[in-house]
Each structure stands twice: as structure tokens, then as C-alpha cells.
């Protein structure tokens, strides 16, 4: 009986110690480290107006669809850009749905709105070329027509942003060189100069674009 009590006491003590460490000390240390060294990122990388109005997060894509703005990558998060439903298409490279999409038709063979409709890469390439005034044989950046693994990638490639500059400039009646210069000023280098590719944050670029237009 004494042996059982000793073992129970030891087990209880170990449980309490690890509960304090793993449920208290460790989370507190991680939180404190985040607040001390990565305060902006730890708090969601929120982007705010001078008056404190939150415009979004620099870590999450938003669905900019107007010609006056740069567009993010396509999204498969929920019905698109749903931060509560981060997701990829999970379609393989040989998938016919990924390449050609799915489009519901009516009795006359015309496209109709349907929850199961899905734009394939060929559809997205065609739409991208049309909205940006590109030729039928002009190369389209891969990130412009593919959905990211999270569906919420906030960045686009420099080539993607550059190809959209003429459309944005035309919609805002700004010189193309002015918009291209704004893109160039928002290019972020590779992480640690070796990981990933140079990129442009769409939300930050679009907010700077609004400020540029307002200052004319």
C-alpha cells in the first residue's frame, strides 16, 4: 500500500510540474519572445491607416478585383480568400479539372452560375491576358494563374505585378512609369537573400497606390 501511495505521489508531482511547464511557462515564454522580437508579426502584421483603422493583414490576401488595383493570386480558400477556410485545390498536375476547369451549362449550352463551377488554369490564363491587354502568345507568370497552398498568399511575383501595371495606370489615369516605379519600390528581396523569390505584397502596394492617387 505504501508503495502505491509513493508512486501515486510521484506521478502526481510529475504531472503538476509538466502542467506548469507546458501549460504555463512554455506558452508564456513563446508569447514574450514574440512580443519582444517579432511584435508586429506576433500581433497579426495588421496594416492600419493613420487614424488607426485596420485595412487588413500583410500576411493574408484580399480579393482585389477592380481594374484600379493590382490583383492577388487566385484563391481556393472557401469560396475564395476566406481566412477562416485556408485551403488548396489538392488537384494533381495531371488533373483535367485543374487544367480545363468545370463549368455548368444550361439546356442551350451556355455557362450558368453554379457552386461547383471551377476555373481551370487555361481559363485563368485567358482571363489574365484579356484583362491586362496581353497578346495570345505572351507568357503569363505561373503565380497569376495558380492557387497557392494556403489560398491566402499575400504576395505576387515581380513579373506579375509589372504586367498588371499598365492596366492599373490606365484605370487611374496615371503615367505607366509612375505605377511601375511604385511597384519597384515595393519589391521585397528573398528571405535572408537566399530563400524564395523577390515578391510584391499586394495589400501594401494597393494602399500605396491609393495614397499616390490621392496626392495628385
Q: Can you annotate each of these PLM segments?
A:
Residues 6, 14, 23, 28-30, ...:
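Flexible, solvent-exposed loop/hinge segments and secondary-structure transition points
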Residues 1-9:
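Cytosolic juxtamembrane amphipathic/interface segments immediately preceding
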Residues 168-216:
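Non-catalytic, structured segments within soluble enzyme domains
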Amino acid at each position: 500500500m505504501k508503495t502505491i501511495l509513493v508512486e501515486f505521489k510521484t506521478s502526481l508531482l510529475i504531472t503538476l510540474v509538466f502542467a506548469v511547464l507546458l501549460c504555463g511557462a512554455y506558452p508564456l515564454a513563446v508569447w514574450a519572445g514574440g512580443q519582444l522580437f517579432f511584435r508586429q508579426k506576433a500581433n497579426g502584421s495588421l496594416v492600419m491607416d493613420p487614424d488607426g483603422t485596420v485595412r487588413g493583414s500583410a500576411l493574408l490576401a484580399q480579393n482585389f478585383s477592380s481594374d484600379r488595383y493590382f490583383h492577388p493570386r487566385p484563391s481556393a480558400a472557401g469560396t475564395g480568400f476566406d481566412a477562416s477556410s485556408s485551403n488548396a485545390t489538392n488537384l494533381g498536375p495531371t488533373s483535367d479539372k485543374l487544367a480545363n476547369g468545370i463549368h455548368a451549362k444550361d439546356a442551350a449550352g451556355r455557362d450558368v452560375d453554379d457552386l461547383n463551377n471551377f476555373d481551370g488554369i487555361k481559363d485563368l490564363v485567358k482571363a489574365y491576358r484579356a484583362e491586362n491587354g496581353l497578346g495570345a502568345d505572351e507568357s503569363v507568370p505561373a503565380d497569376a494563374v495558380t492557387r497557392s497552398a494556403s489560398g491566402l498568399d499575400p504576395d505576387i511575383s515581380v513579373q506579375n505585378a509589372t504586367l498588371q501595371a499598365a492596366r492599373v495606370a490606365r484605370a487611374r489615369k496615371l503615367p505607366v512609369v509612375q505605377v511601375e516605379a511604385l511597384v519597384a519600390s515595393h519589391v521585397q528581396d528573398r528571405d535572408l537573400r537566399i530563400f524564395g523569390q523577390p515578391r510584391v505584397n499586394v495589400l501594401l502596394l494597393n494602399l500605396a497606390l491609393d495614397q499616390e492617387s490621392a496626392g495628385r
